[in-house]
């Protein structure tokens, strides 16, 4: 018993989890009172949505924050997937600062990017103009957005979305259309501090292929590698998937 305790005592303490940088001027999250009324729940949700919008506007448009936590190159899985494909219509859900949308536009795709962070979309539009390409952007919460039916040849979910997106993706894709997903494996929570308990972009082993396979999509590629995350730039376990609508 002593030897075990001594060995444990010699181990280095666990490294602190890394979270999102604080947003200047944004105080602590509002607290929902005990036994809240429907009106209080609605107001709390509104306040949290507004804080989320402010947080992402800051992280995605502040040059120092982008350099610290974001890969400014297009997602590698996306680049590999579309190489050699005939360009078509693409939806970049929760687009952010536009790195993937702009890349697709440069390859000839007609891209629509949707996000709640209006400043990030404006930043993306400016970058697109500088690079001489056109993208369409819409300020919207993807949870309330009309994805359409048989509308897109490609849907991109790069560190974006939630479990409820699977059915919407299946409905929105054209026959033969692809969805490209990269997100965090749940193991990444050992190193990342999850803001507000929001695990929408964290998935358990084989959770993604089960979710999307259940919608009738064909899983073309699935991996759970250790790699540098596009968001956070840390070495973490990731989930990567490409699926196709029959």
Q: Locations of the language-model features?
A:
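A short acidic, Gly/Pro-enriched loop at the edge of an enzyme's catalytic core
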Residues: 145-154
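Conserved class I S-adenosyl-L-methionine
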Residues: 16-85, 87-96
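Conserved SAM-binding motif I beta-strand of class I
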Residues: 110-115
């Amino acid at each position: 018993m002593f030897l075990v305790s001594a060995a444990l005592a010699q181990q280095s303490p666990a490294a602190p989890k890394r979270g999102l940088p604080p947003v200047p001027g944004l105080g602590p999250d509002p607290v929902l009172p005990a036994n809240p009324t429907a009106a209080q729940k609605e107001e709390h949700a509104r306040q949290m949505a507004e804080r989320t919008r402010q947080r992402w506007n800051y992280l995605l448009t502040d040059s120092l924050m982008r350099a610290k936590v974001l890969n400014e190159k297009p997602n590698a899985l996306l680049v590999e997937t579309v190489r050699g494909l005939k360009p078509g219509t693409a939806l970049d859900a929760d687009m952010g600062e536009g790195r993937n949308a702009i890349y697709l536009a440069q390859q000839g795709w007609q891209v629509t990017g949707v996000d709640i962070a209006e400043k990030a979309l404006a930043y993306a539009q400016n970058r697109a103009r500088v690079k001489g390409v056109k993208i369409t952007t819409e300020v919207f919460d993807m949870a309330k957005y009309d994805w359409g039916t048989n509308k897109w040849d490609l849907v991109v979910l790069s560190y974006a979305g939630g479990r409820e997106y699977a059915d919407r993706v299946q409905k929105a894709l054209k026959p033969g259309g692809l969805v490209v997903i990269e997100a965090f494996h749940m193991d990444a929570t050992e190193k990342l501090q999850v803001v507000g308990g929001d695990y929408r972009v964290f998935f358990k082993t084989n959770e993604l292929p089960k979710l999307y396979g259940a919608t009738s999509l064909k899983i073309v590629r699935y991996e759970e590698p250790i790699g540098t995350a596009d968001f956070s730039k840390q070495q973490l376990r990731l989930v990567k998937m490409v699926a196709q609508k029959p």
